UniProtKB/Swiss-Prot annotation:
Keywords: Bromination, Cleavage on pair of basic residues, Disulfide bond, Gamma-carboxyglutamic acid, Knottin, Neurotoxin, Secreted, Toxin
Bilayer-spanning residue ranges: none
Compartment(s): Secreted
Lineage: Eukaryota, Metazoa, Spiralia, Lophotrochozoa, Mollusca
Organism domain of life: Eukaryota
GO CC entries: extracellular region
SS bond partners: 12-26, 19-30, 25-35
Residue numbers carrying 4-carboxyglutamate: 10-11, 20, 31
Residues carrying 6'-bromotryptophan: 6, 15, 38
Functional description taken from the UniProt entry: Induces a sleep-like state in mice.
GO molecular-function term, one example from the UniProt record: toxin activity
Free-text tissue specificity from the UniProt record: Expressed by the venom duct.
Protein name per the record: Conotoxin r7a
Amino acid sequence: APAKRWFGHEECTYWLGPCEVDDTCCSASCESKFCGLW
């Protein structure tokens, strides 16, 4: 199931997985190149 996190004023929904194959990843977690890792 997708995880929900808040980034600024946006509620982001993304799957835990590599950002390059997951375009629903929040931009904040994509900085670490792996969704869900902040």
